[in-house]
Regions:
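Generic surface-pattern signal
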Residues: 102, 135, 223-227
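Zn-dependent metallopeptidase/amidohydrolase metal-coordination segment
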Residues: 142-200, 204-212, 216-232
Length: 232
């Protein structure tokens, strides 16, 4: 399984409240600044590489329609295929936030919404071995799918060789995070797949523990992949 790096921000804009009809000129709309921030990000999308994903929601846009909002809050997350590129997108996000605040005479702050998730440093010997074990235990093995999510296993993979195989628990084409997928986890096929995965991971762990040459090969492959990530 491949994963994307991820960073989450809570972006808060502060302005000046005023009555939207009686004295709108006295206000500085934090909501307008928040909307402009999202507009600026959208203006950058045509130049995004395919791996860059930026998603956001406005969590607070004011309390009443007849009051110019003095506070607005956005929760956003963005993903890329490497930590190096994540930092580049981070700079773009901050520029858009500061530009929007400046244009609307507001202030802005960015706070981490959660800890960063790193992308996956893939290790070819581990992927090859786990594929062989899964096949030996009767599980159909396919190619590694393009990354569509994030996992803290990516963080682990920047510290030591790691792997996170993805198992199919049903023959039906079900979307994740749905009630249909939840129900599929209760069926015998799902339990058989999980047992197959556990047995395969156990076999791989024993190979790592008992085969010094294999351990060395895994570590060398990991170091090579890590250097490539650092040079992106």
């Amino acid at each position: 399984m491949d994963v994307l790096s991820l960073r989450c921000y809570v972006v808060e804009f502060h302005g000046q409240a005023a009555h939207a009809v009686a004295a709108p000129w006295q206000g500085r709309s934090a909501l307008a600044a928040a909307r402009k921030f999202l507009d600026l990000i959208d203006a950058r999308r045509e130049c995004f590489t395919p791996d860059i994903h930026v998603n956001a929601v406005i969590q607070d846009g004011g309390k009443a329609p007849n009051i110019i909002p003095d506070y607005a809050k956005i929760r956003m997350e963005f993903r890329t295929d490497s930590m190096a590129k994540l930092l580049q997108v981070d700079e773009m996000i901050k520029k858009c936030a500061n530009a929007a605040a400046m244009a609307l005479d507001c202030t802005v702050s960015l706070k981490f919404g959660l800890s960063d998730f790193a992308d996956m440093v893939r290790v070819e010997p581990l992927e090859k071995s786990i594929s062989e074990y899964l096949s030996d235990f009767g599980h159909k093995v396919g190619d590694v799918s393009p990354a569509t999510g994030s996992s803290d296993m990516g963080n682990v993979s920047y510290r030591c060789p790691a792997i996170q195989p993805l198992l199919s628990i049903t023959d039906d084409n079900l979307a994740l995070h749905t009630t249909a997928f939840r129900d599929a986890t209760l069926k015998p096929q799902a339990h058989e797949s999980i047992a197959c995965g556990a047995a395969s991971m156990t076999a791989l762990a024993l190979k790592i523990l008992n085969d010094a040459d294999y351990r060395s090969n895994v570590h060398h492959s990991w170091e090579t992949s890590l250097k490539k990530k650092e040079n992106i």
